Structure formats: C-alpha cells, structure tokens
Amino acid sequence: MEEHHIPQAVQIRNAHVHNLKNIDVDIPLGKIVGIAGVSGSGKSSLALGVLYAEGSRRYLDALSTYTRRRMTQAARAGVDEVLYVPAALALHQRPGVPGIRSTFGTGTELLNSLRLMYSRLASHRCPNGHYLAPSLRVAAGKELLCPECGAQFLAPSAEELAFNSQGACPQCGGIGTVRTVDPATLVPDDSLTIDEGAVAPWNSLMWSLMTDICREMGVRTNVPFRDLTAQEKEIVFHGPAEKKHIFYHNKNSNQAGELDFTYFNATYTVENALAKVKDEKGMKRVEKFLKEDICPACHGTRLSAAARAPKLRGLSLDEACRMPLSELVGWVQGVPDSLPAEMRPMAENIVESFTGPAKRLMDLGLGYLTLDRAASTLSTGERQRMQLARAVRNRTTGVLYVLDEPSIGLHPSNIVGLTGVMHDLIADGNSVILVDHDTQILKEADWIVEMGPEAGAKGGHVIAQGTIPAIEADPASQIGPFLSGKADTLRRKRALADALFAQGTLHLSTAQLHTVKPLEVDLPKGRLTVVTGVSGSGKTTLVLESLVPALEARIDGKTLPPHVRALDAEGIAHVKLIDATPIGINVRSTVATYAGVHDDLRRLFARSPDAKAHGYKAGDFSYNTGSLRCPGCDGTGEVSLDVQFLPDVNIPCPDCRGSRYARAAGLVKLTGPAGQTASLPELMDMDVNTAINFCRNMKTVCQKLKILQQLGLGYLTLGEETPSLSGGEAQRLKLASEIGRTQTDSVFVFDEPSIGLHPLDVQVLLGVFQALLDNGATVVVIEHDLDVIRNADYIIDMGPGGGDAGGRIVACGTPEQICNDPASITGRYLRR
C-alpha cells in the first residue's frame, strides 16, 4: 500500500507582501509558532498578510460563487507559493468597540443559552400574577393553564426575553439608560440676569422673546439669577405652559407688535427640542443640556416587566445577569436538580451549552464580569479574550489560528489562562500562530520565527528561527537576550523614594463605580506613575473613567463627574489622553499630513524656481484638492476594481503608481544638501530617516522629522496612510506635536502604550516618557509590561483580583517597595 506523506509544515515561497523581502520560510503545523520582531519588521505581514489571507481565501474559494458574493473576500496574497495551509481564523489585535446594545452576555453568546434556559425551564407567571411550576409543555409549544385562576397563556419564547428584540423595555428601548435634562446646564452662570442670557436653552433653542414671557409670568429678569426667589426659579425651571399676551420689539427690524405666546420653561425647552431632533447637527445643539440616567422603568436591566417575570431557582433573568460569571456558573449547574425528573435531560443539554463556553472565559480570567456589563466599557484585553473564547468554543481540528498580540491587556498572572487555551487548541489538532512581544507568552512557543533586523524598508527578512533554546543562543536574534533574561531593561534614572512628591501631588477621591471601591489616590507631579493590576482590577475605571474626566471637568470649569468626590490638581491646565485608537479612517491622512510636515513642504516647493516658472502655488501641491493631484485616483494613490463574483480589488493607481500626484508634479524639484534633487512625490516615498538627510537645510521640516525619529518612527514613509499604523505607532505619532514644549502644567495619560512593541521598542518608548518628564510633564500609564513597570518612579497596584475581588489599591510605592510587598501580585512577577 502506498504510503501517504502527511505535511509537517506550511511552506511559504517568495513572499513579498508589504515589506517582506521575497522570503522563504516553513511554519511547523500542529505547534505553537511565535512570530517576533521589532515594530514594522513584517510580523503581521507574514502572519496576517500571508498565512491568514491565504488560509481564509482558499477556504472561501471552496464555496459557491452565489455564497461568496455575499461575503467580504480577501485578495490573493503577494506570494509565489503557499503549500499545505489549513483553513485559517484570525483574532485581530484590536477588536472594534461594540455598540450600546452589546453586553458581555451578548458578545460571548452566553445570554442566548441563559434566555433559552429561562424560556424552557423557568416558572412562568400567568396574566393574573400567579406562578406555575416548570413544565415540558413550554418546550412543546403548548398553552399553559393556571391552576389558580384558570387563565390560559403561552410562555415567552427566548426571543421575547431578549432586550434587543421583543423583550426590550418600552421606555429606553433596551438600552438601559435614558437621556434627561441636566439641571446644572440650564443656568451655567447665575451671576447673569435673565435679560443678559442667564437661561442657556432660551439663547440657543428658543426665541429670544421667551425672556419677555418670563417677565409676564412674574419673574424679575433684570436681577442676577442667584438673587431670584425660590418661587421665581421654580417658574424658570418648571413653570406651567400658560399663554401670555405680550408686546415685543424686534431689535433687527426695529418693528414692534403684540402676540399671544405660550411659556416654555427651561426644562421643557430642552425636552421639546430633543423630541424634534432629526439629524446629528440638531442633536449637537441639544446634547449639551442632557445627561444620561439609568432608565426608571427597567432600572438599567434593559428588559420589559414581562421579560423580568419568569423565575428560575428563585431568580429573574436580570438578577442572574447581575451575578459575576464565576458565581453564575455554579448557580446554573444547580438548575437541573431544581427541576422535575422528566425535565432534567433537556435542562442538562441547555446547561452544558452555557457552562462549556463559560469555562473558557473563566480560564481566560474573565470570571469577574457580569453578563449585563456593557461591552463598550470593557478594556481592549477583555474584548480580545471574549473574541478568543468565541473562536475556540467549538472544538475544531485542523484549523490555523492566527492570534495577533493576544497578551494585550493581560497582567502576567492572567497569561497562564491564555497559554492554557493555546495548548488546548494544539491538543485538538490545530495550529497556532502567535504574533507577540511578551517574552512570558513567547516562551510557550514550540518554534519562533524572528523578523527584522529593523523596521520598514530595512525589515522583512527572517533573521532567526528555531526552538526557544536555539533563539536564545543565536547571536543574530534580537529577542533572544530578552527571552534568556540577560538584557538590561532598566533604562532611566528613577526618582528617589523620599523625593517622589517634591514637585507636588495630584489627589483624587472617588466613590464606588462598577466594581471599584471608594478610593483615595495620590499621584506625584512631574513623575512617571504606572497603574498596574490584574485584568478587571479597576485600572481603567480609576484612570480613564475617574482621573481623566475629573481633570477635564476641572480644567473646563465644569462640575466633577458624580462619582468623583474631590480632586486636588493645582497648576494643571491640560490633560492629554494618548490611546492606541487608529488615527482616522481615511486613506487621505498620511504621516506627513498628521505631523504637519506636508504643508511646510508644499510651501517650500511653491517657492522653487520650477514652480514659479509654471505658476504653481502651495495649494496646487495638495494631493487632496490641488491641480497637481493624480486625476486617475483623485489623490488616494489607489483605485478599486469591481469584479463581479470576486472581491473588490484595490490596486495601486496605474497612472501615478501610488504616489497620489500627476506626472507634472514630478517635474518640480528641490535640491538637497549634497546636490541631489527630489520632487514632492519622491520625498513622500522616503522614510523619515532618509528625508531628514535630504531636508537638513529646511529648518522647520527637519525639526518636525527629527521628533518623529526621536519617537522611534524613523522607518515610516512620509506618505504612509495613518489608519494602517499599529496601535503603538499611532500612540507615538499623536505625541509628535507635544515633544519639546514646556509641559509643567500638563498630565499625559497613556493606555497600554507598549501594545505592539518589541522589548527594544519599549526602550524607545521609555525615552519618549523621559523627554516629556524632562519638560516638566506628569505622566500616568496603565501598563502590564514588566519592563515599563520596572522603570516607573511610582507604582499604584490595583487588585487583589478582578471584578468584585478587586477594585482596591493593594500597594503603592517605588518598584523596590512593590517587590517587597507580599500583598502585590505585580511585585511577585517583578521579583523574578
């Protein structure tokens, strides 16, 4: 019998996606393969651009053209040959932020099983309020008969228990919140009189003659609002809709007249305007007078009274959704035993459909979350683990899982659960591709492929590959010293413990919010403070939902958020949140336009002899609106081809070859310091490092480019589209306008800035922090990366666990103090 050869590896030949330099590489199958390398070295190009693109495309190609035309399809990857690639699933680095209707329960699909449980297994209430014992008649779709009053009714289906469908609260529509008028916004300055415009809604949402009607209602309009009697203020805010006969004088036309007009109090003015809103522009005028409150009808549960009626083990659906997942699983497992014997087989099936996926989520450290938690309030790491759990719920075999930075948002103690899931996937006969920088998770790989040696045009090569010991011993490897622990990771001189607060203190006092208990927090001014803690311990709530909004409110002279009791931030005039959200969604935004270099270059080219000879102005050199933009692609650099039954194909514009400019733009040249010449399209095609050499004598341009180089972005080309940048690159580019300024009155807040950064890039990031600190800034960072934590002046460690088990400050101090604090889990990992 002929022996069949079973492929042992995916064979990639001559891959040239993005910056890959025609590489040949074999990726072992049935193993965890880590892909490492500095930012921009080609890791994602190999993992997502080749392996995932080909694995998913070939699977979709097996479907009928009728099915495929309804799907978004990937184009063929830029590679000569890929052999033995399995069907592929990718978990991207940054899952999209879900809408307001999405919760942890809907996102994980656990709520589907729970709703089915309540529909089929619960005690249902008859129209007269009597509860019936659980019955198999529900599953059979038969009517139920109330033994007490004889009423006949049908039990609600699972769909009728869904807040996104028939079970929605009629008042809030299943959102759980309602928009109401915020009284604090109606009279923002009570030192003004009503005649001077004290009542804000009457100025922007109502005719000016409402002041005259108010006067007719008996309110003095010529005294400061604060001096009005309580009765007069009540008329302004809630007065009755009485019709008044008034004389009015139109200041513009200088005409007078009289008319009958109904009084609209300040509150009703806003409510009336809200009811008439038809577009976003109208909403913008009204929303400054609104606040979001918990819906009074459903109390934030999103469900109608009927959907909250069924009871299972004594709890309603909304009460079960309020339990942390770890508790809920135990409660659900007790459901079959609480039912009549004939219902138990069905109950066990439904319970199993709930507990299987729930166990995965708990393995990934999400047991502290409740099913009713709004998905938009989850951190990136939590959303990514939700996505991972959903992808691995069905025990597949022979699938290639591509995980793009799964360690995002994970404390070192949470990575254990993640590695468990990866090993389970391998045990089931799958393959895992792991794009990551975290040495703790890379050590779990059976094989490492390292890309490099640098970023951008100088990357795209395989510089090392092999097992962990082989990589550690390979002198060409850049990740090897970090895997072996031999690299020096302390990169900055930290403040001494007794001088930490020498430049001042930021003090924040908060009441309970989500699972975070009331807190009193001190942060040293002019220092690098890192907020640490396991996932769900309250870092995001403390920094992004408390500190940042409180500072913004104080700077703008507004009231503090309701849960913030006090804030002492003397001398702070700016707070800047630098997160990893992509910069724009438009291909017209490039590194040069975002950094402000493009305008300077257009002006320089317009002053050149060539431009003057042709009569070109600076505006002509704009690839968005100028006369020199490419007419074929309108300055986008690419054209989209609509091929029926096949995916739309975006190709570089055949006219300008991706440069965005017409040929005439190539005739206008500037001369560099060494006598070389370049047109604006050629300059936009240079990376920052090369452009600095060419622009040495262009002072303003050179200064801006050197800041990008200082931020570790020297490998980006000036014409690179900003939406395509990684999270870490986007964060650093946002800082370009801040470096070099005096920042003593500024607080910079970073949300996991080490995302997507190789340990060598983390050292560049620490240099960026130091540049801000040298200019007097206060830097606050939410971070899990141990190298960043080690370099902090001050650490605030949240915990001890996630959810209800967290929400407290377990330790704070210098890294040495945290290491020696037995209560700190972070300290335990810092000591290693």
Which residue stretches match the model-derived regions?
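Conserved phosphate-binding elements of NTP-dependent enzyme cores
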Residues: 1-832
